Amino acid sequence: MNETIPGSIDIETLIPDLMIIIFGLVGLTGNAIVFWLLGFRMHRTAFLVYILNLALADFLFLLCHIINSTVDLLKFTLPKGIFAFCFHTIKRVLYITGLSMLSAISTERCLSVLCPIWYHCRRPEHTSTVMCAVIWVLSLLICILDGYFCGYLDNHYFNYSVCQAWDIFIGAYLMFLFVVLCLSTLALLARLFCGARNMKFTRLFVTIMLTVLVFLLCGLPWGITWFLLFWIAPGVFVLDYSPLLVLTAINSCANPIIYFFVGSFRQRLNKQTLKMVLQKALQDTPETPENMVEMSRNKAEP
């Protein structure tokens, strides 16, 4: 027997929506702080440009989540047609952008470790800015064309074979991003544990590893289901699956928490500002033995 509360709101709908709103508000605050500090208070390096754009994508993605969950709780209905298409297209754009930024961060870090001379001497100065612009434009273009070919943008135009081919392309693109993310991460881990005795943990390395891990656990399932379920059960609106949406909200909320945790680890918080904590979390140089982060031990290295 299904439980309901006054106002005929289903508990199974209420709980996920409330969780999304709670995680969303926490994530909005955290990502807004990260964006403000990186955008206006800190000198931006190659990695910080990507993290700035990732924070923006997570902020907007959570904002869409909160709007959608609030509409569900208040029992409103989003207008049909172009408005609904734009709203859900924005969510997809932000998801693809977030995955692309994370893949770019991991790849950039991998290049800096495996090819340090080329990276520091020959890498074009504005590569990060150009890559971020390309990622935003490409993500937007992919989702708009998907809506056009599959009839979401124009109900009079729908070609199943073209729509199917385009969905295969999008799935292949997401798979490519996932493979790049995994391979670059594995290369970093192999380099750390097997290839270089003089390579030590840095806080930036720990931050990237934790961010990738959280995405694989919380962000990836929605992307897989979103595209693969089209072939298993055509016509099912995957974006409405509440557990996956809660996981994506956790994923977008987690990054600022990771930055705070890594940046404040073994530090005296009463003497740390948020800017100092964020700088520590994104620090790319090994610390002194007394303060080095040792993730596999409970004590600092003597």
Curated annotation (Swiss-Prot):
It is a multi-pass membrane protein. The keyword Transmembrane helix applies. GO terms for molecular function: G protein-coupled receptor activity; transmembrane signaling receptor activity. PROSITE patterns: G_PROTEIN_RECEP_F1_1 (PS00237), G_PROTEIN_RECEP_F1_2 (PS50262). The chain crosses the membrane at residues 18-38, 47-67, 82-102, 130-150, 168-188, 212-232, 243-263. One of its GO terms (cellular component) is neuronal cell body membrane. Glycans are attached at residues 2, 68, 159. CDD domains: 7tmA_MrgprA. The keyword Membrane applies. Keywords: Acute phase, Cell membrane, G-protein coupled receptor, Glycoprotein, Membrane, Receptor, Transducer, Transmembrane, Transmembrane helix. It holds the Pfam family 7tm_1. GO terms for biological process: acute-phase response; cell surface receptor signaling pathway; chemosensory behavior; response to chloroquine. Residues 39-46, 103-129, 189-211, 264-302 are cytoplasmic. Coiled coil: none annotated. Expressed exclusively in dorsal root ganglia and nodose ganglia. Expressed in a subset of sensory neurons that includes nociceptors. Expressed in the subclass of non-peptidergic sensory neurons that are IB4(+) and VR1(-). Residues 1-17, 68-81, 151-167, 233-242 are extracellular. Belongs to the G-protein coupled receptor 1 family. Mas subfamily. This is Mas-related G-protein coupled receptor member A3. It comes from Mus musculus (Mouse). The gene is Mrgpra3.
